[in-house]
């Protein structure tokens, strides 16, 4: 299992690969070479599953097969583990920060998603809610970029959306459409759409329809099928352009471009690139948050690759 996460404010990114260590890399200023700047060897006792930078770039969250979450603080270029969050009963599969940085979401094989709140004056994290709406493993959690709304994907083939109600969190929508495990999710920059990918080799684009403050529903407006030969393990929708990248079990990366956002988005979608990227399953893709043509991929072949996507694609 490999993961990558670009630092939100600059070009360095972090990677961990096949173990319990986190490696932080930076691009050399005078070349296209990358240098490992730091290796974080403490914190976890088993393989790390996911990592995420806070929006400010000063904190890093990691989660592991050891059922814990570590919060790392960056000071003077060095990182130290400032908190270990415990509560999940099994491996923690994904962590993700809200756009405000106040909330951190985690999900686990124990069928739950947790919301942790950062108490700034105490520099501590408290559990704000435990969400147990899924009937199987929760594979992925992601926050809307525009509001405190959380979305989760599960082995039970469903997607769930959570909102804060009276200082607690509850499931407001259950989305059904995938025929097998939903592996990953990624929002469009507007927060009005997101894309999901699944074991059924399908991408789906979902749109929020609002007819009033309390009258909200999510509908599937596009199903992208026939392009992938194996399960799609990850998807990332660039916040700088309308390109969607996928990581597939057939060792390949595919890129789609949305020409225009409409209710019939399938008529505005172009399949623009295919890369036989790795020698094994590709399990992660990430667009750079500040450079619109840079994409990173990670694979079970123990490699991370950085791609420059040309504008003519």
Swiss-Prot record:
Pfam families: WD40 (PF00400)
WD repeat copies, ranges: 1-35, 43-82, 87-126, 133-172, 177-216, 227-266, 277-313
Biological processes annotated in GO: iron-sulfur cluster assembly; protein maturation
InterPro entries hit by this protein: CIAO1/Cia1, G-protein_beta_WD-40_rep, WD40/YVTN_repeat-like_dom_sf, WD40_repeat_dom_sf, WD40_rpt
GO CC terms: cytosolic [4Fe-4S] assembly targeting complex
Statement: the UniProt record of this protein carries the keyword Repeat: yes
Keywords recorded for this protein, A-Z: Repeat, WD repeat
CDD domains: WD40 (cd00200)
Record-linked PROSITE patterns: WD_REPEATS_1, WD_REPEATS_2, WD_REPEATS_REGION
Function: Essential component of the cytosolic iron-sulfur (Fe/S) protein assembly machinery. Required for the maturation of extramitochondrial Fe/S proteins.
Family as reported in the entry's similarity comment: Belongs to the WD repeat CIA1 family.
Name of the molecule in the record: Probable cytosolic iron-sulfur protein assembly protein CIAO1 homolog
Organism, scientific name: Trichoplax adhaerens
């Amino acid at each position: 299992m490999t993961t990558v996460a670009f630092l939100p404010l600059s070009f360095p990114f972090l990677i961990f690969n096949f173990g319990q260590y986190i490696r932080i890399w930076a691009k050399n200023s005078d070349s296209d070479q990358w240098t490992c700047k730091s290796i974080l060897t403490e914190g976890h006792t088993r393989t790390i599953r996911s990592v995420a930078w806070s929006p400010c770039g000063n904190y890093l969250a990691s989660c592991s097969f050891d059922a814990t979450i570590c919060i790392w603080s960056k000071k003077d270029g060095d990182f130290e583990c400032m908190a270990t969050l415990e509560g999940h009963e099994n491996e923690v599969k994904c962590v993700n920060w809200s756009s405000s940085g106040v909330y951190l979401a985690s999900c686990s094989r124990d069928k739950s998603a947790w919301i942790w709140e950062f108490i700034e004056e105490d520099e501590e994290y408290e559990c704000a809610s435990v969400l147990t709406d899924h009937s199987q493993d929760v594979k992925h959690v992601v926050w809307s970029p525009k509001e405190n709304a959380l979305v989760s994907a599960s082995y039970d083939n469903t997607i769930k959306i959570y909102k804060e109600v009276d200082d607690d969190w509850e499931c407001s929508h259950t989305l059904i459409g995938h025929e097998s495990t939903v592996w990953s999710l990624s929002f469009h920059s507007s927060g009005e759409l997101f894309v999901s990918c699944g074991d059924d080799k399908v991408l789906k684009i979902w749109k929020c329809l609002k007819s009033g403050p309390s009258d909200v529903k999510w509908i599937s407006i596009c199903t992208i099928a026939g392009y992938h030969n194996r399960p799609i393990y990850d998807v990332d929708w660039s916040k700088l352009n309308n390109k969607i990248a996928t990581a597939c079990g057939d060792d390949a990366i595919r890129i789609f471009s949305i020409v225009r956002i409409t209710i019939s988005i399938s008529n505005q979608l172009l399949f623009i690139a295919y890369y036989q990227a790795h020698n094994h399953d590709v399990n992660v893709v990430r667009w750079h948050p500040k450079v619109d043509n840079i994409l990173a991929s990670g694979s079970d072949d123990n490699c991370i690759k950085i791609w420059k996507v040309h504008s003519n694609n």
